[in-house]
């Protein structure tokens, strides 16, 4: 049996001091008083004699209590550690390498066909002089000269670009924003409001404040009242339960509303970086150019930044990575971010060569079917919107009218529904474009997505609703329900289930169809549009809109 280890003198004394009870001092007999003794007597010990806890016992009890508390709090500590790890991982995704100032792609000299390619000699020269932030990659040079070079793969069966940027990948790229102190500017295209309204934006922004900017209001039909548009947008935002600081109606082309956005950015920025977010081709790069052009009059930093601004193009996926722009004199940077490519938009299914046909270049003009009251009714007919949309009117009131708002390059054709299938097979790629050309039509996926719509006519003096086609435009359903003087028509209207419209809408399979309240466009809209009646408290909570 091994002998117990010998303790040093100091260890013995420490052990004895912890084990022995603390000696009590005897009271001074000369100053003893029974009353004073009763008031100053120490509290009775927990035990008497050998049962009294020693200092060692109290120390052990304290340690055991601390360990028990640690076990109770361990899950919370583990959760905090997990959040810290996620934050570090997300912040590590923040781009730090040199990137093309036109598209944000990391500069590289290996693959000439990939985004971000720069000739090795140019790269070495710019790197030697610390000028890599002034380099434009080969793809952006071609885009700036009008070439349609996509970097985004399609969903419609056509070969896409070399680098496909999906929504999930972009969410991963921008995940660090949740942990940054930033001001978020979210852009939405008014022509494609539902299709370009980026869902789950809080996945990017976290708790950072958001300013909502509506772009391309200059494309709305002439004589449109922007007061009605602003109220309609705010009502839609409230229904989507997105909390924003304010709503701005803007046009990057005419600079309408841009000054108001800049003023609010300067007020809310407070030294933070500013990020421009939005789906692909809502006009982020054009909006940044308009901002820099407006700010250049008073801010020399913004004036200098105009020389190296992001490339603008009709191609989805022009911007491939966050682009840092030195735009503010008072601190903080401006970032143009990649557009989120949504699979449910028309741009995801058509060929890159056909993309310009989806972008309106001038004010939208209403195209009505039937054009007037003397024309044949819609029941039993099918309307083709280019080769991308087919609307079968199964049942409608005699005075129902469908009004199309979208790109002028897409023609509208009406044929009897019984002949619609044969007409589409014969004319797709010829009369019905996009897809343009028989070669593209052979690889076309067709109109496989079908949605049945039952629309009730609520009032006869205003449109019943809009049918919005994601990535294209919208169709206003207008029941011209003026009482008819023809008794046969009146009887037919009464038999038609008290004013119900039955439509069958065909689109490419991934494309979404939205039924929404009618967008108040045109001169007559200010007469039929009704503003929401709100209490003072509701009015205070609603975001304000500006233009």
Swiss-Prot record:
Q: What is this protein called?
A: Putative nitric oxide synthase
Q: Name any one GO molecular function.
A: GTPase activity
Q: What is its EC number?
A: 1.14.13.39
> What Gene3D superfamilies does the entry give?
P-loop containing nucleotide triphosphate hydrolases
**InterPro entries for the chain:** G_CP_dom, GTP-bd, NOA1, NOA1/YqeH-like_C, P-loop_NTPase
Role of this protein: Produces nitric oxide (NO) which is a messenger molecule involved in hormonal signaling and defense responses in plant.
Q: Give a yes or no for keyword Lipid biosynthesis in this entry.
A: no
Q: Where is the signal peptide?
A: none
Domain CP-type G span(s) in chain numbering? 167-343
Instruction: Name the family.
Output: Belongs to the TRAFAC class YlqF/YawG GTPase family. NOA1 subfamily.
Q: Any keyword S-adenosyl-L-methionine?
A: no
Under catalytic activity, the entry for this protein gives: 2 L-arginine + 3 NADPH + 4 O2 + H(+) = 2 L-citrulline + 2 nitric oxide + 3 NADP(+) + 4 H2O
Q: Which UniProt keywords apply?
A: NADP, Oxidoreductase
Q: List the disulfide bonds.
A: none
Q: What class of enzyme is it?
A: oxidoreductase
- Name the segments for region: Disordered: 24-57, 72-91
């Amino acid at each position: 049996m091994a002998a117990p280890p010998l303790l040093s003198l100091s260890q013995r004394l420490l052990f004895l001091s912890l084990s022995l009870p603390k000696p009590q001092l005897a009271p001074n007999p000369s100053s003893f008083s029974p009353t004073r003794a009763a008031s100053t007597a120490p509290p009775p010990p927990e035990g008497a004699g050998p049962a009294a806890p020693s200092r060692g016992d109290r120390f052990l009890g304290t340690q055991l209590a601390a360990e028990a508390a640690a076990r109770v709090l361990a899950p919370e500590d583990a959760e905090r550690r997990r959040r810290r790890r996620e934050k570090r991982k997300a912040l590590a995704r923040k781009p730090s390498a040199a990137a093309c100032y036109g598209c944000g792609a990391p500069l590289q000299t290996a693959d000439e066909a990939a985004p971000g390619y720069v000739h090795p000699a140019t790269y070495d020269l710019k790197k030697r002089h610390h000028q890599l932030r002034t380099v434009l990659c080969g793809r952006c040079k071609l885009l700036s000269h009008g070439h349609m070079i996509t970097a985004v793969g399609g969903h419609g069966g056509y070969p896409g670009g070399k680098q496909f940027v999906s929504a999930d990948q972009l969410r991963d790229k921008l995940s660090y924003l949740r942990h940054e102190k930033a001001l978020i500017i979210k852009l939405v295209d008014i022509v494609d409001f539902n299709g370009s309204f980026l869902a789950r934006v809080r996945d990017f922004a976290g708790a950072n404040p958001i300013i909502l900017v509506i772009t391309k209001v200059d494309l709305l039909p002439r004589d449109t009242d922007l007061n009605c548009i602003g109220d309609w947008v705010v009502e839609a935002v409230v229904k989507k339960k997105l909390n924003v600081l304010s709503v701005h109606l803007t046009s990057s082309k005419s600079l309408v509303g841009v000054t108001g956005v800049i003023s609010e950015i300067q007020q809310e920025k407070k030294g933070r970086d500013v990020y421009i977010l939005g789906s692909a081709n809502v006009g982020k790069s054009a909006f940044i150019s308009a901002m820099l052009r407006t700010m250049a009059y008073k801010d020399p930093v913004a004036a200098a930044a105009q020389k190296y601004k992001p490339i603008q193009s009709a191609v989805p996926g022009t911007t491939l990575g966050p682009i840092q722009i030195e735009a503010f004199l008072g601190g903080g940077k401006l970032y143009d971010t990649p557009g989120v490519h949504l699979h449910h938009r028309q741009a995801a299914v058509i060929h890159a060569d056909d993309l310009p046909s989806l972008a309106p270049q001038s004010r939208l003009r209403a195209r009505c079917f039937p054009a007037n009251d003397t024309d044949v009714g819609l029941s039993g007919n099918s309307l083709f919107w280019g080769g991308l949309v087919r609307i079968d009117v199964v049942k409608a009131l005699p005075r129902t009218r469908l009004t199309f708002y979208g790109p002028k390059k897409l023609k509208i054709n009406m044929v009897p529904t019984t002949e619609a299938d044969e007409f589409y097979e014969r004319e797709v790629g010829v009369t019905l474009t996009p897809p343009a050309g028989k070669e593209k039509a052979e690889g076309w996926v067709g109109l496989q997505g079908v949605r049945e719509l039952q629309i009730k006519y609520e009032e006869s003096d205003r449109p019943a609703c809009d049918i919005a086609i994601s990535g294209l435009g919208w169709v206003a359903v207008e029941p011209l329900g003026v009482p008819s003087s023809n008794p046969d028509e009146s009887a037919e209207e009464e038999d038609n289930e008290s004013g119900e419209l039955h439509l069958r809408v065909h689109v490419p399979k991934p494309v979404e169809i939205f039924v929404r309240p009618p967008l108040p466009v045109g001169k007559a809209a200010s007469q039929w549009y009704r503003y929401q009646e709100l209490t003072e408290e509701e009015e205070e909570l609603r975001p304000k809109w500006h233009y």
